[in-house]
């Protein structure tokens, strides 16, 4: 290696753009200036359209992007490992920042994938309307106890006659035949054809019905595949050997209006013919929520079953392919090693935050609300109107009517009459039939018949049920009677089958307030079909269950993702996960392993770009970078060691102890709370207990439990109080929220303390004074405190001071009685009657009330800033010395006070440390990396 004295005095050059946090350490303005005429360094060496204008010796130099095929593959049940040999030729420099893995394979999203709300089949049918069906039963009034076939249905298609051949639908007049045309039974009468207009009346009608062997389902959601090109759906009959024949399973049943006579005989000529058939009936996207009995067989009772659409479940790869590549997992890390030295430049730590760091880095570089399909970059989001309900009622001042199709709505007919000549018409005898007027005139008396529906209220109520009620915790739901659900509560079938009483989240709940439902606060709001980012990523793959995918996956590991690789030969390998719960994300969060999803990788290639430099320029750059004064240094964006501390269910206190160490270069703490169920074990290649596929806050930053913290106290063993005791509350105790606020310490009409608000403004934006100041736009990004802080308040009945208060439980509350279902999303029942809930909080009769306050702050990590200089700023002794002066190593004790939760959770605590890697490439095929981390040199925060 050349000695420094032999090298020219290069000035510094920053190659990563103004706000990038990672850059080549010393090096290269003079170099940039010298080469600027034919190669601009403007966009971090990455403009693939720029090629050198001179000194190009071969056409190979112009070939900027190369594909590397793996030299070794290892495809196992849970992972796919690909190894590449990167050969960087002389006078070339490979830009690792431009590399990506190009992966092709096949994805089966499983039967739980449903990329839409509602149903695709007969969505306009009433939820409880049956298909035209038959069943076997005894006649109710007949003495004969034999089982007979009963038919219920619609015969919509008119005809001119009915004979043994069926319904006559026309006459063949070609070649003077004049022969009747009968319905072709394999597809006629067609269900979509009927009377064409209001006056279209025939004497004979035909229709189709499902035979008793086809088990009844409501029309809403029913589908039967066609069995011929005309759209007919009848099954084929089988012969004695069980082989399918070419004959359809169709039987004609004839029906006559009872009571007619022909002469002395009873009139029995058929008026209706029903073509009964068996079909392949299925309900691909609905399920039954009301079932009168346990049997699925066709019966009169099952005519009144009621359907509900299956819950939407979008499934796609995670944001920026989180979870697809192994990071921070011992034994599964990658390799980037020079073949000459075999030293691996990738040194992984389980407590590094590679995925989360990448998410936050992207947020600092640009607008995360803009989707970038190539890296599958569409950030998880939720509809703010679902998380926090602004219930301002409905604007339904005008009634909404629906009218009969004929604009009258009556079938009453009237005889034309007139007054006899010379009479005045005041008695019946003065009237006679009018021969000039028809004997049957259809006239409507009074106003047009109409029915009223409150469209606005129904839309609002429907929104609340679909978006809020169905996402309530499972403890608020029940299984409909006579419906059997699987025991595994993580399956789609179980989640889909559970229903909730609509009155739990109705239009009158918290009316007039801006408030989130208390049970919903601790439910992951990103696991929702209105997660626009997930919906976009799901739709990128298409709308079918089976997907041949072709994706491009970036490298995120901070030490090598921006590296300039100098000439030599290198081994590069990485592991890719195949665990569907880790690499796929679903909006319901069901266990995709159990629900039949799978992934297969067919090929993993690596694409890499060389800098388009003239050879002599590249060799100059190489010579510079080989010099150890120009080693490449990279900071981890988060620069933090993380630690997960378990919080048992119902626990409210979390003590933490860190053994004595030197706190030099320590910047502070970030913390939030995670659910154990939603946090995989990164240390294992495959976590068998991770039975969940929703958003993973630990990796993707979808935090939502920040509001559950009450206090945090921080104490170093020296017991030095926090420097600069100018905070509102106790120096070493941070009170985050207080429910009883006698001193008026809360802020923004919620229960967050002014103290905590100021600490957050200080640590996020360096706004450390009390005054109105909004952070600059480039600081106030998607994951920032100011953007996500949501204060709320509401009034509720004062149960203590209102003497007439009665705690009426849900089954005994009624509101909209007669117009809604009782405690179920089923047919309306009851009678119109005054509501008994909720108590009025407004008007002349407003009852005594109390105010409740709270806040939500999602996506953010709470931060407490710290400077290791504080250790030298404690209270001075009589000698004018700091007590800490003699001993610079200190133990740390922290205590977190949190709200109790019904399930085990984790405290996710980041210690903001100095985390940097220095990469040195002294010779061909040699790459050395030094990782520096202080105060936690390696491992996790407990070592």
From Swiss-Prot:
The keyword Acetylation applies. The modification Phosphotyrosine is found at residue 931. One of its GO terms (molecular function) is structural molecule activity. The keyword 4Fe-4S does not apply. Its main location: virion. The record marks 768 as: Involved in interaction with pre-protein VI. The modification N-acetylalanine is found at residue 2. Keywords: Acetylation, Capsid protein, Cytoplasmic inwards viral transport, Host nucleus, Host-virus interaction, Late protein, Microtubular inwards viral transport, Phosphoprotein, T=25 icosahedral capsid protein, Virion, Virus entry into host cell. One of its GO terms (biological process) is symbiont entry into host cell. It is found in: Virion; Host nucleus. GO terms for cellular component: host cell; host cell nucleus; T=25 icosahedral viral capsid. Induction: Expressed in the late phase of the viral replicative cycle. It comes from the Viruses. Gene3D superfamilies: Adenovirus Type 2 Hexon, domain 4, Hexon Major Viral Coat Protein, domain 2, Hexon Major Viral Coat Protein, domain 3. All late proteins expressed from the major late promoter are produced by alternative splicing and alternative polyadenylation of the same gene giving rise to non-overlapping ORFs. A leader sequence is present in the N-terminus of all these mRNAs and is recognized by the viral shutoff protein to provide expression although conventional translation via ribosome scanning from the cap has been shut off in the host cell. Major capsid protein that self-associates to form 240 hexon trimers, each in the shape of a hexagon, building most of the pseudo T=25 capsid. Assembled into trimeric units with the help of the chaperone shutoff protein. Transported by pre-protein VI to the nucleus where it associates with other structural proteins to form an empty capsid. Might be involved, through its interaction with host dyneins, in the intracellular microtubule-dependent transport of incoming viral capsid to the nucleus. Homotrimer. Interacts with the capsid vertex protein; this interaction binds the peripentonal hexons to the neighboring penton base. Interacts with the hexon-linking protein; this interaction tethers the hexons surrounding the penton to those situated in the central plate of the facet. Interacts with the hexon-interlacing protein; this interaction lashes the hexons together. Interacts with host dyneins DYNC1LI1 and DYNC1I2; this interaction might be involved in intracellular microtubule-dependent transport of incoming viral capsid. Belongs to the adenoviridae hexon protein family. This is Hexon protein. It comes from Human adenovirus D serotype 9 (HAdV-9).
